């Protein structure tokens, strides 16, 4: 194997490893939890769309905690 081809192979492996590490770090998130009690609904670390918001509002809780948009 030529020196240039060998160097290209090493660079390819390094770049692939870096991409794998970065993508694994980006996908590591907290689990989505929705806790519903008689008095409140707590939403944590969830991607919420308009249909989910309407469904939660239809439950008519006394309070809706930790609701955030991402």
Curated annotation (Swiss-Prot):
Keyword Metal-binding: no
Keyword Transport: yes
Localization of this protein: Host endoplasmic reticulum membrane
Topology, Cytoplasmic side: 28-70
Main location per the UniProt record: host cell
InterPro entries named in the record: TGBp3 (IPR003411)
GO cellular component: host cell endoplasmic reticulum membrane; membrane
Lumenal compartment segments: 1-4
Membrane-spanning parts: 5-27
Single GO BP term: transport of virus in host, cell to cell
Origin: domain of life: Viruses
Keyword terms, alphabetized: Host endoplasmic reticulum, Host membrane, Membrane, Transmembrane, Transmembrane helix, Transport, Viral movement protein
Its job: Plays a role in viral cell-to-cell propagation, by facilitating genome transport to neighboring plant cells through plasmosdesmata. May induce the formation of granular vesicles derived from the Endoplasmic reticulum, which align on actin filaments.
Misc. comment: TGBp1, TGBp2 and TGBp3 seem to act together for cell-to-cell propagation. TGBp1 is the main movement protein that physically cross the plasmodesma with the viral genome. TGBp2 and TGBp3 would facilitate TGBp1 function.
Record-stated family: Belongs to the Tymovirales TGBp3 protein family.
Record-given protein name: Movement protein TGBp3
The organism of origin for this protein: Potato virus X (strain CP)
């Amino acid at each position: 194997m030529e020196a240039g081809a060998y160097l290209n192979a090493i660079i390819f492996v390094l770049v692939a490893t870096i991409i794998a590490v970065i993508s694994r770090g980006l996908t590591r998130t907290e689990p989505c939890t929705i806790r519903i009690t008689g008095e409140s609904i707590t939403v944590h670390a969830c991607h919420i769309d308009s249909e989910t918001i309407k469904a939660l509002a239809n439950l008519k809780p006394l309070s809706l905690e930790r609701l955030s948009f991402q």
